[in-house]
Amino acid sequence: MIDIGRELQVAINTGKVIIGLRETKKSLLTGAPKLVIIAANAPRWAREDIEYYAKLAGVPIFTFPGSSIELGAAAKRPHKIMALAVVDPGQSEILKLVEHA
């Protein structure tokens, strides 16, 4: 089983991760990230918005099994994170989350 928190940290430190709902949506419209992670407690409107743009871009979505507060803590950030986009995983194996989901 993949440790989501550790792999997310490795992706942030060695790759490129876009944090935030608005920025994630922009990246789906312009750059097509490799993976989108959304918090389990994201509001329905936000989830539907991200799912729509991810489907258009052909990007897989992984639902983080915790709240936006826990996703922020996993990313070592002092705030809530509703969604993030992995543009470059770096040395992490975070893209394997999609295979296990």
Curated annotation (Swiss-Prot):
Keywords: Ribonucleoprotein, Ribosomal protein. This is Large ribosomal subunit protein eL30. Gene3D superfamilies: 3.30.1330.30. GO terms for cellular component: cytosolic large ribosomal subunit. The keyword Transport does not apply. GO terms for molecular function: RNA binding; structural constituent of ribosome. Transmembrane segments: none annotated. It comes from the Archaea. The gene is rpl30e. It comes from Pyrobaculum calidifontis (strain DSM 21063 / JCM 11548 / VA1). The keyword Ion transport does not apply.
